[in-house]
């Protein structure tokens, strides 16, 4: 009886080739997952920046409208959806700042406002499930609201 060592070597080659393939596929999967996660985080930041820019521009336009005597003004700003947990977001309006508070602390941001209007700015809005935010000037106050004003 003669032993065939070539057959055993071939089988070992198949096993090592398979294991090398599994290793390469695992590394590729982890690499793709990292790319996808980084892209999603970048898109979140860009969407939040665009939302904050749109809101601050609407507030500045409302400041201008507040200078007209006996006027009321409302502007709807659409909130772009993000992958972040928006139920953790709170938007606050002060006389000189628009502030986004993230309860997790990762996406906190703020925008400076000119504060040129003589009207006080107020409003705190929870962003859970929000599609649009209203910037309203009525009765001498500029505010953020979720519901369309009825004036």
Stretch-by-stretch model annotation:
Residues 1-6:
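N-terminal leader/signal peptides at the extreme start of proteins
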Residues 10, 14-39:
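C-terminal juxtamembrane segment of a hydrophobic transmembrane alpha-helix
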